[in-house]
Amino acid sequence: RKGDTRTNWMLKNQTELLDGTIYDLIFIGQDLAGNQTGFITTPDITYDITLPVFAILDPVNEAFVNYLTVSYEISEPLREGTITWTALNPVKDPESPRIISINREEMIEGVYTDVLLANMTNLIDSVTYNLEMKGADLATNEGIPSKVTSVHYDFSPPIITLTHPANNTYQAKTFLNYELSEDLLYGQVSWLQLYTRGVTPDTVILQGNELLAGLHDTTMFTAIVKLKDGASYDLIFDAYDLAKNEAVTGRISNVTYDFTPPEIELQYPATLAAVNNTNLSYFISEFLLEATATWTWVDGVLDMDDHIHPLEPFEREPGEKQFIMLTNAPDLVDGAYYDVTIYGNDRAGNPSNLATAKNVKYDVTSPVITITNPGPDVFITSTQTAYDLSED
Protein backbone atom coordinates (compact mmCIF):
# COMPACT_ATOMS: atom_id res chain seq x y z
CA ARG A 1 0.00 0.00 0.00
CA LYS A 2 0.93 3.64 -0.48
CA GLY A 3 3.45 4.82 2.06
CA ASP A 4 3.97 1.35 3.54
CA THR A 5 7.49 0.42 4.76
CA ARG A 6 8.49 -3.21 5.03
CA THR A 7 11.35 -4.10 7.41
CA ASN A 8 12.76 -7.61 7.70
CA TRP A 9 9.89 -8.82 5.56
CA MET A 10 9.71 -12.44 4.44
CA LEU A 11 7.97 -12.75 1.06
CA LYS A 12 5.25 -15.37 0.82
CA ASN A 13 6.65 -16.81 -2.38
CA GLN A 14 10.28 -16.69 -1.25
CA THR A 15 12.34 -19.61 -2.56
CA GLU A 16 15.25 -21.26 -0.76
CA LEU A 17 18.58 -19.53 -1.29
CA LEU A 18 21.92 -21.31 -1.27
CA ASP A 19 24.11 -20.68 1.75
CA GLY A 20 27.32 -18.90 0.84
CA THR A 21 26.05 -17.69 -2.54
CA ILE A 22 26.31 -14.09 -3.74
CA TYR A 23 23.10 -12.61 -5.18
CA ASP A 24 21.86 -9.41 -6.77
CA LEU A 25 18.50 -8.34 -5.33
CA ILE A 26 16.23 -6.96 -8.10
CA PHE A 27 12.86 -5.40 -7.25
CA ILE A 28 10.21 -4.85 -9.98
CA GLY A 29 6.83 -3.33 -9.19
CA GLN A 30 3.63 -2.12 -10.91
CA ASP A 31 0.95 0.18 -9.55
CA LEU A 32 -2.79 -0.31 -9.92
CA ALA A 33 -2.78 1.67 -13.18
CA GLY A 34 -0.22 -0.67 -14.67
CA ASN A 35 2.74 1.69 -14.40
CA GLN A 36 5.98 -0.23 -13.82
CA THR A 37 8.75 0.89 -11.48
CA GLY A 38 11.61 -0.40 -13.55
CA PHE A 39 14.48 -2.41 -12.09
CA ILE A 40 15.57 -1.56 -8.56
CA THR A 41 18.80 -3.49 -7.93
CA THR A 42 20.97 -4.14 -4.84
CA PRO A 43 24.08 -6.02 -6.05
CA ASP A 44 26.53 -8.42 -4.37
CA ILE A 45 24.52 -9.66 -1.43
CA THR A 46 26.09 -12.71 0.23
CA TYR A 47 23.59 -15.08 1.71
CA ASP A 48 25.21 -16.60 4.82
CA ILE A 49 23.37 -18.65 7.40
CA THR A 50 26.33 -20.72 8.61
CA LEU A 51 27.70 -19.91 12.05
CA PRO A 52 31.35 -18.93 12.15
CA VAL A 53 33.66 -21.45 13.77
CA PHE A 54 36.59 -20.31 15.85
CA ALA A 55 38.81 -22.10 18.32
CA ILE A 56 41.57 -21.18 20.74
CA LEU A 57 44.50 -23.47 19.88
CA ASP A 58 46.95 -22.23 22.50
CA PRO A 59 47.02 -22.09 25.47
CA VAL A 60 45.19 -25.32 26.24
CA ASN A 61 43.23 -26.39 29.29
CA GLU A 62 45.20 -26.40 32.56
CA ALA A 63 48.36 -25.18 30.88
CA PHE A 64 51.16 -23.28 32.63
CA VAL A 65 52.35 -20.44 30.40
CA ASN A 66 54.72 -17.49 30.65
CA TYR A 67 53.48 -15.56 27.60
CA LEU A 68 50.52 -13.36 26.65
CA THR A 69 50.22 -14.54 23.05
CA VAL A 70 47.38 -16.73 21.80
CA SER A 71 46.97 -19.05 18.84
CA TYR A 72 43.54 -19.42 17.27
CA GLU A 73 41.67 -20.38 14.11
CA ILE A 74 38.75 -18.62 12.37
CA SER A 75 36.63 -20.27 9.66
CA GLU A 76 35.53 -16.98 8.02
CA PRO A 77 36.05 -13.25 8.46
CA LEU A 78 34.41 -11.79 11.54
CA ARG A 79 32.56 -8.55 11.97
CA GLU A 80 33.44 -8.41 15.64
CA GLY A 81 35.22 -10.61 18.15
CA THR A 82 36.58 -10.70 21.69
CA ILE A 83 38.73 -12.91 23.89
CA THR A 84 38.01 -12.66 27.60
CA TRP A 85 40.37 -13.58 30.46
CA THR A 86 38.49 -14.29 33.70
CA ALA A 87 40.47 -14.87 36.88
CA LEU A 88 39.40 -17.89 38.91
CA ASN A 89 40.23 -15.83 41.98
CA PRO A 90 39.03 -12.32 41.11
CA VAL A 91 40.50 -10.94 44.32
CA LYS A 92 43.94 -11.39 42.78
CA ASP A 93 42.93 -9.49 39.63
CA PRO A 94 40.53 -6.60 40.29
CA GLU A 95 40.29 -5.91 36.53
CA SER A 96 38.88 -9.36 35.80
CA PRO A 97 37.17 -10.17 33.52
CA ARG A 98 39.50 -8.61 30.96
CA ILE A 99 37.54 -8.36 27.69
CA ILE A 100 39.96 -7.83 24.81
CA SER A 101 38.53 -6.68 21.47
CA ILE A 102 40.04 -8.30 18.38
CA ASN A 103 41.11 -5.91 15.63
CA ARG A 104 39.86 -6.31 12.06
CA GLU A 105 43.21 -7.57 10.77
CA GLU A 106 43.14 -10.18 13.53
CA MET A 107 39.71 -11.46 12.44
CA ILE A 108 40.44 -12.55 8.88
CA GLU A 109 39.81 -16.19 8.03
CA GLY A 110 42.75 -18.46 8.86
CA VAL A 111 45.07 -19.76 11.54
CA TYR A 112 46.89 -17.32 13.82
CA THR A 113 49.96 -18.54 15.69
CA ASP A 114 51.48 -16.86 18.75
CA VAL A 115 49.64 -13.60 18.23
CA LEU A 116 49.91 -10.79 20.76
CA LEU A 117 46.57 -9.06 20.30
CA ALA A 118 46.84 -5.35 19.58
CA ASN A 119 44.55 -4.54 22.51
CA MET A 120 46.05 -7.09 24.92
CA THR A 121 46.72 -5.97 28.49
CA ASN A 122 49.12 -7.40 31.06
CA LEU A 123 47.87 -10.23 33.24
CA ILE A 124 48.65 -10.77 36.91
CA ASP A 125 51.58 -13.06 37.65
CA SER A 126 50.72 -16.42 39.23
CA VAL A 127 46.97 -16.09 38.59
CA THR A 128 44.84 -18.74 36.89
CA TYR A 129 42.39 -17.62 34.19
CA ASN A 130 39.61 -19.04 32.04
CA LEU A 131 39.65 -17.87 28.40
CA GLU A 132 36.60 -17.43 26.17
CA MET A 133 36.55 -16.38 22.51
CA LYS A 134 33.35 -14.90 21.03
CA GLY A 135 32.54 -13.42 17.65
CA ALA A 136 30.03 -12.77 14.89
CA ASP A 137 30.57 -13.02 11.15
CA LEU A 138 29.82 -10.40 8.52
CA ALA A 139 26.21 -11.62 8.39
CA THR A 140 26.00 -11.17 12.20
CA ASN A 141 25.82 -14.92 12.79
CA GLU A 142 27.25 -15.51 16.27
CA GLY A 143 29.55 -18.50 16.62
CA ILE A 144 29.64 -20.94 19.51
CA PRO A 145 32.12 -19.55 22.07
CA SER A 146 35.48 -21.33 22.32
CA LYS A 147 36.58 -21.88 25.91
CA VAL A 148 39.84 -22.82 27.60
CA THR A 149 39.87 -23.43 31.34
CA SER A 150 42.38 -23.08 34.17
CA VAL A 151 45.34 -21.54 32.40
CA HIS A 152 48.00 -20.59 34.96
CA TYR A 153 50.02 -17.53 34.00
CA ASP A 154 53.49 -17.53 35.53
CA PHE A 155 56.02 -14.91 34.47
CA SER A 156 58.50 -15.29 37.34
CA PRO A 157 61.46 -17.70 37.37
CA PRO A 158 61.67 -20.26 40.16
CA ILE A 159 64.11 -19.54 42.97
CA ILE A 160 66.60 -22.23 43.96
CA THR A 161 68.20 -21.89 47.39
CA LEU A 162 71.12 -24.21 48.14
CA THR A 163 71.92 -24.57 51.85
CA HIS A 164 74.17 -27.65 52.01
CA PRO A 165 76.98 -28.32 51.35
CA ALA A 166 78.74 -24.99 51.74
CA ASN A 167 81.44 -23.65 49.46
CA ASN A 168 85.00 -24.86 50.06
CA THR A 169 84.08 -27.72 52.40
CA TYR A 170 84.85 -31.39 52.81
CA GLN A 171 81.93 -33.83 52.84
CA ALA A 172 81.57 -37.50 53.73
CA LYS A 173 78.02 -37.71 52.31
CA THR A 174 76.62 -36.75 48.91
CA PHE A 175 73.26 -35.42 50.09
CA LEU A 176 72.05 -31.95 49.14
CA ASN A 177 69.83 -29.49 51.00
CA TYR A 178 67.83 -27.19 48.74
CA GLU A 179 64.61 -25.20 48.66
CA LEU A 180 62.33 -24.50 45.67
CA SER A 181 59.97 -21.54 45.48
CA GLU A 182 57.59 -23.45 43.19
CA ASP A 183 57.10 -26.81 41.48
CA LEU A 184 59.52 -27.59 38.67
CA LEU A 185 58.89 -29.16 35.30
CA TYR A 186 62.57 -30.03 35.00
CA GLY A 187 65.64 -29.91 37.19
CA GLN A 188 69.13 -31.34 37.14
CA VAL A 189 72.16 -31.30 39.41
CA SER A 190 75.64 -31.71 37.93
CA TRP A 191 78.89 -32.45 39.71
CA LEU A 192 81.78 -30.93 37.73
CA GLN A 193 85.09 -32.42 38.83
CA LEU A 194 87.80 -29.82 39.36
CA TYR A 195 91.48 -29.87 38.50
CA THR A 196 90.95 -32.63 35.92
CA ARG A 197 90.76 -32.09 32.17
CA GLY A 198 88.37 -33.83 29.82
CA VAL A 199 86.02 -35.10 32.52
CA THR A 200 82.29 -35.12 31.72
CA PRO A 201 80.11 -33.78 34.56
CA ASP A 202 78.10 -36.36 36.50
CA THR A 203 74.46 -35.31 36.19
CA VAL A 204 71.30 -36.33 38.03
CA ILE A 205 67.82 -35.59 36.62
CA LEU A 206 65.35 -34.76 39.39
CA GLN A 207 62.35 -37.06 39.69
CA GLY A 208 58.96 -37.11 41.43
CA ASN A 209 58.94 -35.36 44.80
CA GLU A 210 62.38 -33.93 44.12
CA LEU A 211 60.69 -31.41 41.77
CA LEU A 212 58.10 -30.14 44.25
CA ALA A 213 58.15 -26.73 45.91
CA GLY A 214 59.43 -26.51 49.46
CA LEU A 215 62.40 -27.54 51.56
CA HIS A 216 64.30 -30.67 50.59
CA ASP A 217 66.49 -31.72 53.50
CA THR A 218 69.32 -34.27 53.29
CA THR A 219 68.18 -35.32 49.83
CA MET A 220 69.85 -38.36 48.33
CA PHE A 221 68.68 -38.27 44.73
CA THR A 222 67.02 -41.34 43.25
CA ALA A 223 69.53 -41.38 40.40
CA ILE A 224 72.53 -40.33 42.48
CA VAL A 225 75.89 -40.72 40.80
CA LYS A 226 78.96 -42.31 42.36
CA LEU A 227 81.47 -39.58 43.06
CA LYS A 228 85.22 -40.10 43.25
CA ASP A 229 86.68 -40.38 46.73
CA GLY A 230 89.02 -37.47 47.42
CA ALA A 231 87.95 -35.47 44.35
CA SER A 232 86.74 -31.86 44.40
CA TYR A 233 83.62 -30.71 42.57
CA ASP A 234 81.49 -27.72 41.71
CA LEU A 235 77.76 -28.46 42.08
CA ILE A 236 75.50 -26.85 39.47
CA PHE A 237 71.69 -26.83 39.84
CA ASP A 238 69.67 -25.93 36.69
CA ALA A 239 65.87 -25.95 36.45
CA TYR A 240 62.75 -24.45 34.92
CA ASP A 241 59.22 -24.28 36.28
CA LEU A 242 55.94 -25.57 34.87
CA ALA A 243 55.68 -22.49 32.65
CA LYS A 244 59.28 -23.07 31.47
CA ASN A 245 60.70 -20.02 33.22
CA GLU A 246 64.38 -20.77 33.73
CA ALA A 247 65.81 -20.39 37.21
CA VAL A 248 69.04 -18.60 37.96
CA THR A 249 71.61 -21.39 38.13
CA GLY A 250 72.45 -22.47 41.66
CA ARG A 251 76.12 -23.20 42.28
CA ILE A 252 78.22 -24.54 45.14
CA SER A 253 81.97 -24.26 44.63
CA ASN A 254 84.87 -26.51 45.54
CA VAL A 255 83.30 -29.34 47.53
CA THR A 256 85.71 -32.20 48.26
CA TYR A 257 84.15 -35.61 48.89
CA ASP A 258 86.04 -37.79 51.34
CA PHE A 259 84.49 -41.17 52.09
CA THR A 260 87.56 -42.78 53.73
CA PRO A 261 88.03 -42.49 57.52
CA PRO A 262 91.43 -41.35 58.75
CA GLU A 263 93.84 -43.84 60.31
CA ILE A 264 95.93 -43.18 63.42
CA GLU A 265 98.74 -45.43 64.65
CA LEU A 266 100.04 -44.80 68.18
CA GLN A 267 103.70 -45.87 68.20
CA TYR A 268 104.80 -44.55 71.60
CA PRO A 269 104.06 -45.35 74.37
CA ALA A 270 103.29 -49.03 73.88
CA THR A 271 100.80 -51.10 75.87
CA LEU A 272 102.14 -52.11 79.33
CA ALA A 273 105.09 -49.74 78.99
CA ALA A 274 106.45 -47.63 81.81
CA VAL A 275 107.34 -44.07 80.88
CA ASN A 276 108.72 -41.01 82.62
CA ASN A 277 107.35 -38.48 80.13
CA THR A 278 104.18 -37.59 78.26
CA ASN A 279 105.76 -37.59 74.82
CA LEU A 280 103.94 -39.29 71.95
CA SER A 281 104.94 -40.88 68.67
CA TYR A 282 102.17 -41.47 66.14
CA PHE A 283 101.22 -41.63 62.47
CA ILE A 284 98.20 -39.88 60.86
CA SER A 285 97.02 -40.77 57.34
CA GLU A 286 95.45 -37.36 56.58
CA PHE A 287 94.93 -33.95 58.10
CA LEU A 288 92.51 -33.99 61.02
CA LEU A 289 90.07 -31.17 61.52
CA GLU A 290 90.05 -31.95 65.24
CA ALA A 291 91.77 -34.49 67.44
CA THR A 292 92.43 -35.21 71.10
CA ALA A 293 94.96 -37.16 73.13
CA THR A 294 93.44 -38.67 76.27
CA TRP A 295 95.07 -40.22 79.34
CA THR A 296 92.45 -42.24 81.25
CA TRP A 297 93.38 -43.45 84.76
CA VAL A 298 92.97 -47.22 85.20
CA ASP A 299 95.17 -48.28 88.16
CA GLY A 300 97.91 -47.34 90.60
CA VAL A 301 98.01 -44.06 92.47
CA LEU A 302 94.60 -42.45 92.14
CA ASP A 303 94.22 -39.61 89.65
CA MET A 304 90.87 -37.80 89.84
CA ASP A 305 91.55 -35.40 86.97
CA ASP A 306 90.43 -35.74 83.37
CA HIS A 307 93.24 -35.51 80.86
CA ILE A 308 91.63 -34.77 77.50
CA HIS A 309 93.92 -32.54 75.48
CA PRO A 310 93.22 -31.11 72.00
CA LEU A 311 95.93 -31.38 69.39
CA GLU A 312 97.12 -28.19 67.75
CA PRO A 313 96.93 -27.89 63.91
CA PHE A 314 100.60 -28.79 63.33
CA GLU A 315 100.09 -31.85 65.56
CA ARG A 316 97.21 -32.94 63.29
CA GLU A 317 99.13 -32.79 60.02
CA PRO A 318 99.45 -36.09 58.11
CA GLY A 319 102.58 -38.17 58.54
CA GLU A 320 104.72 -39.38 61.44
CA LYS A 321 105.34 -37.45 64.64
CA GLN A 322 108.37 -38.71 66.56
CA PHE A 323 108.54 -38.40 70.32
CA ILE A 324 106.88 -34.99 70.48
CA MET A 325 105.71 -33.18 73.56
CA LEU A 326 102.20 -31.88 72.93
CA THR A 327 101.55 -28.18 73.25
CA ASN A 328 98.73 -29.10 75.62
CA ALA A 329 100.63 -31.72 77.63
CA PRO A 330 98.92 -33.43 80.60
CA ASP A 331 99.94 -33.20 84.26
CA LEU A 332 99.90 -36.86 85.28
CA VAL A 333 100.19 -38.49 88.71
CA ASP A 334 103.40 -40.30 89.49
CA GLY A 335 102.78 -44.00 89.93
CA ALA A 336 99.44 -44.04 88.12
CA TYR A 337 98.51 -46.31 85.20
CA TYR A 338 96.74 -44.89 82.17
CA ASP A 339 95.16 -45.88 78.89
CA VAL A 340 96.51 -43.45 76.28
CA THR A 341 94.24 -42.76 73.28
CA ILE A 342 94.44 -40.53 70.21
CA TYR A 343 91.21 -39.93 68.30
CA GLY A 344 90.03 -37.41 65.70
CA ASN A 345 87.84 -36.49 62.74
CA ASP A 346 88.95 -35.48 59.27
CA ARG A 347 87.69 -32.41 57.40
CA ALA A 348 84.72 -34.37 56.05
CA GLY A 349 83.72 -35.49 59.54
CA ASN A 350 84.86 -39.09 59.14
CA PRO A 351 85.87 -40.46 62.57
CA SER A 352 89.24 -42.13 62.99
CA ASN A 353 90.00 -45.35 64.78
CA LEU A 354 90.85 -45.25 68.49
CA ALA A 355 94.64 -45.56 68.65
CA THR A 356 95.25 -46.82 72.20
CA ALA A 357 98.08 -47.99 74.43
CA LYS A 358 96.77 -49.73 77.56
CA ASN A 359 98.07 -49.80 81.13
CA VAL A 360 100.92 -47.40 80.62
CA LYS A 361 102.67 -46.60 83.90
CA TYR A 362 103.72 -43.03 84.51
CA ASP A 363 106.78 -43.07 86.75
CA VAL A 364 109.01 -40.07 87.35
CA THR A 365 110.47 -41.21 90.71
CA SER A 366 113.96 -42.65 90.64
CA PRO A 367 114.19 -46.19 92.06
CA VAL A 368 115.79 -46.68 95.52
CA ILE A 369 118.19 -49.62 96.09
CA THR A 370 119.03 -50.58 99.67
CA ILE A 371 121.87 -53.11 100.32
CA THR A 372 121.14 -55.07 103.48
CA ASN A 373 124.01 -57.59 103.27
CA PRO A 374 126.91 -57.30 103.59
CA GLY A 375 126.93 -54.38 105.93
CA PRO A 376 129.59 -51.67 106.03
CA ASP A 377 133.06 -52.30 107.44
CA VAL A 378 132.82 -56.11 107.56
CA PHE A 379 134.94 -59.02 106.36
CA ILE A 380 133.11 -61.53 104.11
CA THR A 381 133.86 -65.06 102.98
CA SER A 382 131.34 -65.09 100.06
CA THR A 383 130.00 -62.81 97.35
CA GLN A 384 126.37 -63.21 98.32
CA THR A 385 124.44 -60.00 98.75
CA ALA A 386 121.02 -58.98 99.96
CA TYR A 387 119.24 -55.83 98.83
CA ASP A 388 115.82 -54.16 98.65
CA LEU A 389 114.33 -52.47 95.54
CA SER A 390 111.73 -49.70 95.90
CA GLU A 391 110.09 -50.68 92.60
CA ASP A 392 110.42 -52.99 89.69
Whereabouts are the PLM-identified features?
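Signal that preferentially marks extracellular ectodomain short beta-strand elements
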Residues: 2-21, 32, 106-126, 138-139, ...
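Short, solvent-exposed loop/linker segments at the N-terminal edge
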Residues: 61-66, 167-172, 270-276, 376-381
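Surface-exposed, proline-enriched loop/turn segments that connect beta strands in immunoglobulin-like
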Residues: 56-60, 162-166, 266-270, 371-375
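Solvent-exposed serine/threonine-rich low-complexity stretches and specific carbohydrate-binding patches
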Residues: 1, 94-109, 199-213, 304-318
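A structural signal for beta-strand boundary/capping segments at domain termini and interdomain linkers
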Residues: 36-38, 142-144, 246-248, 351-353
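Conserved structural position at the C-terminal beta-strand
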Residues: 27-29, 133-135, 237-239, 342-344
